[in-house]
């Protein structure tokens, strides 16, 4: 059967989950399960092209991400960053060096917030102390999106504005054609949420954001941080 040239290919997704030490290092004994965390990168792909959602913090993990995308055989067109935290965005330059025809994008508020994350003093006093000699030296911010949509082989990928979840200007990426939400840090799956930036009011906003995502009735929800043994069932919206 010959596919009509106007017929869109079915989209699929795959995830790369990598484990690292958490940023809280002064936990008491008996809390070993809280001393590590994972990050998730998601590859949404069609017949030829792909979009990756989020990167990692360290040089080694971002190189693993590059190798994983390369192995997929897909043409990477876009790197979408859900929010400003460095553990989701420090790999932009590494990916663009390997995939120079791709573009890195985020909503304007995230682009602005990332300027603080890549400030040399902040890198020196926070990230380099936690991960010495592991953070990329060349850190860049993505381009600002002019709309709330991306396109992949004829399918819309819709940006969801979550407001404040575990940090300000949190977003997710919704793929209506396959019922997928790549949630970023709006959703945690079997991992203790990062709470230091939150307040009582922001946590209420977080709950409201989860309710909005649940209202989309997604088939799959990919958490920004997840236990690798868990699936991507939407029930984790209620467990975040």
Question: Could you tell me what each predicted segment is?
Answer:
Residues 180, 202-240:
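Divalent-metal (often Zn2+) His-rich catalytic cores of metallo-beta-lactamase-fold enzymes
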Residues 1-48:
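Zn-dependent metallo-beta-lactamase
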Residues 59-60, 84-89, 111-114, 166-168, ...:
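Active-site environment of divalent metal-dependent phosphoester hydrolases
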Residues 9-11, 45-50, 149-158, 175-180:
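Beta-strand-turn-beta hairpins that frame and shape the catalytic cleft
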Residues 60-106:
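Active-site metal-binding motif and surrounding structural segment of the metallo-beta-lactamase
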Residues 31-38, 48-78:
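Pre-active-site segment of Zn-dependent metallo-hydrolases
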Residues 53-56, 77-85, 105-108, 181-184, ...:
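Active-site neighborhood of phospho(di)ester-bond hydrolases with catalytic His/Asp-centered motifs
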Residues 112-163, 167-169, 176-177, 210, ...:
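Metallo-beta-lactamase
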């Amino acid at each position: 059967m010959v596919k009509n040239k106007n017929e869109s290919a079915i989209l699929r997704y795959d995830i790369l989950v990598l484990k690292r030490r958490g940023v809280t290092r002064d936990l008491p004994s008996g809390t070993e399960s809280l001393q590590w965390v994972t990050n998730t990168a998601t590859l949404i792909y069609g017949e030829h092209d792909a979009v990756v959602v989020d990167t990692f913090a360290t040089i080694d993990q971002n190189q693993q991400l590059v190798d994983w995308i390369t192995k997929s055989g897909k043409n990477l067109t876009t790197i979408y960053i859900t929010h400003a935290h460095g553990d989701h965005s420090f790999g932009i330059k590494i990916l663009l060096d390997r995939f120079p025809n791709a573009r890195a994008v985020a909503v304007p508020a995230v682009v602005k917030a990332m300027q603080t994350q890549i400030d040399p003093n902040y890198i020196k006093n926070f990230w380099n102390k936690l991960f010495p000699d592991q953070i990329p030296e060349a850190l860049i911010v993505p381009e600002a999106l002019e709309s709330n949509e991306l396109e992949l082989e004829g399918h819309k990928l819709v940006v969801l504005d979550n407001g404040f979840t575990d940090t300000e200007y949190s977003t997710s990426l919704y793929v209506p054609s396959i019922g997928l939400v790549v949630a970023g840090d709006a959703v945690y799956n079997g991992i203790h949420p990062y709470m230091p930036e939150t307040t009582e009011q922001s946590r209420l906003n977080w709950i409201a954001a989860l309710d909005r995502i649940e209202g989309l009735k997604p088939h799959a929800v990919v958490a920004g941080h997840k236990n690798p043994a868990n699936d991507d069932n939407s029930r984790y919206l209620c467990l975040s």
